[in-house]
Amino acid sequence: MHSSALLCFLVFLAGVGASRHQSTLSEDNCTHFSVSLPHMLRELRAAFGKVKTFFQTKDELHSILLTRSLLEDFKGYLGCQALSEMIQFYLEEVMPQAENEDPDIKQHVNSLGEKLKTLRLRLRRCHRFLPCENKSKVVEQVKSTFSKLQEKGVYKAMGEFDIFINYIEAYMTMKMKI
């Protein structure tokens, strides 16, 4: 009887130790995240560079989709939600359409999407960067404008992806100072 109780206790201690180790790993990943962020942003910019000319030359509209209001939302109390919603918007609405624009760019748009998914995953693992639940009115406005632009919306949204990367960088820089 004593040996089975001892065995259960040892299994319990092993589990506690493993969970502490996992927690430490997660915290370490968040600590190193600020070091790896510039590299991830460079990778996003490089991936976007492969499709930038294609989308910007097809964008014939003289308006801005990603306005300064979005950057202000990123910097404000809704920054977390605005960033989360914009990443989701690009991954679920913009990039699937962008992939269908030309077979020659499909692979590059897909690669850009994978890099954005990796960034989102790392942000979610470090709750200090994405601890949010509220909706951003500016993001809803971006989505509404995108929809109204119909087939031209994908050129506009993809053509301005570099602005989006800059806004991500501004948000992350602000969060790292906190």
From Swiss-Prot:
Which Cys pairs are S-S linked? Answer: 30-126, 80-132
Check the record and name the Pfam families matching this protein: IL10 (PF00726)
* Glycosylation, residue list: 29, 134
The source's domain of life comes to Eukaryota
Among Gene3D superfamilies, the record links this protein to:
1.20.1250.10
Q: Which UniProt keywords apply?
A: Cytokine, Disulfide bond, Glycoprotein, Secreted, Signal
The record, for InterPro entries, names:
4_helix_cytokine-like_core (IPR009079), IL-10 (IPR000098), IL-10/19/20/24/26 (IPR020443), IL-10_CS (IPR020423)
Which locations, inside or outside the cell, does it occupy?
Answer: Secreted
Does the UniProt entry include the keyword Signal?
A: yes
Q: Which GO terms describe its molecular function?
A: cytokine activity
Q: Which GO terms describe its biological process?
A: immune response; interleukin-10-mediated signaling pathway; negative regulation of B cell proliferation; negative regulation of cytokine production involved in immune response; negative regulation of inflammatory response; negative regulation of interleukin-6 production; negative regulation of membrane protein ectodomain proteolysis; positive regulation of B cell apoptotic process
- Where primarily located? secreted
Q: Does the keyword Secreted apply?
A: yes
Task: Kindly indicate where the leader peptide sits in this chain.
Answer: 1-18
Q: One GO cellular component from the entry?
A: extracellular space
Q: How does it assemble?
A: Homodimer. Interacts with IL10RA and IL10RB.
Q: Describe the family membership recorded for this protein in Swiss-Prot or TrEMBL.
A: Belongs to the IL-10 family.
Protein task: Major immune regulatory cytokine that acts on many cells of the immune system where it has profound anti-inflammatory functions, limiting excessive tissue disruption caused by inflammation. Mechanistically, IL10 binds to its heterotetrameric receptor comprising IL10RA and IL10RB leading to JAK1 and STAT2-mediated phosphorylation of STAT3. In turn, STAT3 translocates to the nucleus where it drives expression of anti-inflammatory mediators.
Name by which UniProt lists this protein: Interleukin-10
Q: Which organism is it from?
A: Felis catus (Cat)
